[in-house]
Structure formats: structure tokens, C-alpha cells
A protein has these predicted regions:
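C-terminal nucleotide
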Residues: 8-151, 164-194
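N-terminal pre-core extensions flanking Radical SAM catalytic domains
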Residues: 158-162
Length: 194
């Protein structure tokens, strides 16, 4: 999915990706809203529980079918508490993505923040792909009154935190943290090589 996000990216837009059809719908970022990415901790999915999450969600799909089509009512069909929590994260995250797209189009910043914060809570508690360092970074970013919401991003187990922030506030908070990058609205992605 990372490669598709990069290849299909459009400056100043979010990309809503349908992972079944691979259709991409671009949604413009409202004026005055910026995306901040903070590198928190080096990570590698090798040696993490990432493959466990893949196996757990595959097991859930054996029980209730494709998670893409599942609803919270389907959770009652899962007896194992751990698998139920993994499924709950995926099911509710799918719904949050659609709600986020609608809130972005409507420029409902409070709702955008609520959805990001709930996503992080679910990643941390139900899917368990966060860690204390990442949780602390999310809490710290949320202390800035200009931040609407923050969450971990990517495969989890370290890596980056992303936040949505109003541009109208002073940037002093961010200048004190050299690992934060404000993503320019006018830049397009390029390729990187080692």
C-alpha cells in the first residue's frame, strides 16, 4: 500500500484508496490545514509481531469472512477475545476511514481529530501495534492546541506519528522538535534511493 500511496499521491490532497479495486479518490486538504509527520523510533517489521497480526486477521476471516464486508455485529461470532479485538480494530478502522474522508470534504476539523485519536486508541489497545514511546509521542503532539488529532502511521511497532494541525497557530512548538516535518502542500513525491 505504501507504494500505491506514493505513486498515486497528489500535492495538497489525501488519497482514499479502495484496496479491493485499487481505485483512488483524491480529496483536497482544506486551506489552513497541514499534515505533520514526526519520526519517533526506528523500526523494522522483521522481528515484530506484524506477521502475527497478518495471521490473526486471516484467522478472523476464516470465521466471519472478509473484514472489508464485516460489521461490528459480526464480532459476536468470534469467541476468542484476542481475535475479536483484532477484528474490531479492522472493522472500526474501515468505518473511520470513510468517516474521515467525509469529514475532510466537509472541513470538519474537530471530527477529523476525533477520528485520528480514536484510530490511535484502537491501534494501541485493540490491534496492539503501538508501544509506550509511540503513545508518548502522540500524547505530546496532542498538547499543542493547534493539533486536531494524532496517531501512529504505517505498519506500527515504531516508525512515525502523523498529526493534523491548523496553520494559523505559531510554529514554535514544532521548531523545538527537529524530528517533525511539516508536509508542504505544493510538493509532489519523488523517488528515493540509497
Amino acid at each position: 500500500m505504501d507504494q500505491l500511496c506514493i505513486a498515486a499521491g497528489r500535492p495538497g490532497h489525501a488519497a482514499l484508496i479502495d484496496c479491493r479495486s485499487l481505485d483512488v479518490r483524491h480529496i483536497g486538504l482544506p486551506a489552513g490545514l497541514e499534515v505533520v509527520v514526526e519520526f519517533v523510533a526506528a523500526r523494522s517489521l522483521v522481528g515484530t509481531e506484524y506477521s502475527d497480526r497478518v495471521a490473526q486477521t486471516a484467522r478472523v476471516e476464516e470465521i466471519i469472512g472478509p473484514l472489508r464486508d464485516a460489521t461490528e455485529a459480526d464480532l459476536t461470532r468470534i469467541d476468542d477475545d484476542l481475535l475479536r479485538r483484532r477484528a474490531r480494530h479492522v472493522i472500526t478502522e474501515n468505518q473511520r476511514v470513510l468517516e474521515f474522508a467525509a469529514a475532510l470534504e466537509a472541513d470538519e476539523r474537530g471530527e477529523l481529530g476525533r477520528l485520528m485519536n480514536e484510530s490511535h486508541r484502537s491501534l494501541s489497545e485493540d490491534f496492539e501495534t503501538s508501544n509506550p514511546t509511540m503513545d508518548a509521542a502522540v500524547r505530546r503532539l496532542r498538547e499543542d492546541p493547534a493539533v486536531h488529532g494524532a496517531r501512529i502511521t504505517g505498519g506500527g511497532f515504531g516508525g512515525c506519528v502523523v498529526a493534523l494541525r491548523s496553520q494559523s497557530r505559531r510554529r514554535r512548538f514544532w521548531r523545538s522538535n527537529s524530528s517533525s516535518v511539516i508536509v508542504p502542500r505544493s510538493r509532489s513525491a519523488s523517488h528515493f534511493s540509497n
